[in-house]
Amino acid sequence: MAKYLGPKLKLSRREGTDLFLKSGVRAIESKCKIDHLPGQHGSRRSRLSDYGIQLREKQKLRRMYVILERQFKKYYKKAVRMKGNTGENLLILLESRLDNVVYRMGFGSTRLESRQLISHKSIIINKKVINIPSYQIKPNDCIEVKEIAKKQSRIKAAIEISEQREKQSWIDVDRVKMQGIFKKFPDRSDLSSEINEHLIIELYSK
């Protein structure tokens, strides 16, 4: 599957917000001018049309979870078929991806690193090795680092870094044992207020 190989900070600058594509050891504001577009002569942002605003919001969410357009649209279509609010359903589907849950639990310093751990068969779900980053986690699933992988320095470093991040109420984590429980799907109030999912739904509904 194709993936973006360029500078991660450039994507955050493009969207005007921290997409959490880097480890977070240093605040993104200290690494780049987040309010300027990327490029040597990056200028301040011009006024966008309604379509442009919707598109930027979609790109921001898609890049935050490191997902390509084709897969992102599949999540939208699945969210439409689910009961309840389509926008909230979309966020829940993204938030319950295995690579995101591994990141939230602190076993990977970024979602991309978490995806690598999964692909390398370093993550166990309910006592079974799962190597599919998009695997959908369900309430009460147990996620743990494979015993042989617990010695990896990058996992230990990621756990240390995760102590600086906000704790998530929908997961329980034992960072010493390197395992956690996905207690429930998050409520909308648990997730970032910087995301306006209604704009994304409006974009795809056209």
From Swiss-Prot:
Oligomeric and partner information: Part of the 30S ribosomal subunit. Contacts protein S5. The interaction surface between S4 and S5 is involved in control of translational fidelity.
PANTHER family (alphabetical): 30S 40S RIBOSOMAL PROTEIN, SMALL RIBOSOMAL SUBUNIT PROTEIN US4M
NCBIfam families cross-referenced by the UniProt entry: PRK05327.1 (NF003717), rpsD_bact (TIGR01017)
Q: What this chain does, per the record? A: One of the primary rRNA binding proteins, it binds directly to 16S rRNA where it nucleates assembly of the body of the 30S subunit. With S5 and S12 plays an important role in translational accuracy.
Print the keywords alphabetically: Ribonucleoprotein, Ribosomal protein, RNA-binding, rRNA-binding
Protein name, please?
Small ribosomal subunit protein uS4
List, for all copies, the residue spans of the domain called S4 RNA-binding: 96-158
| Similarity comment text for this entry | Belongs to the universal ribosomal protein uS4 family.
Question: What is a single cellular component term in the Gene Ontology annotation?
Answer: small ribosomal subunit
- What span is annotated as the signal peptide, if there is one? none
- Kindly name one Pfam family recorded for this protein: Ribosomal_S4
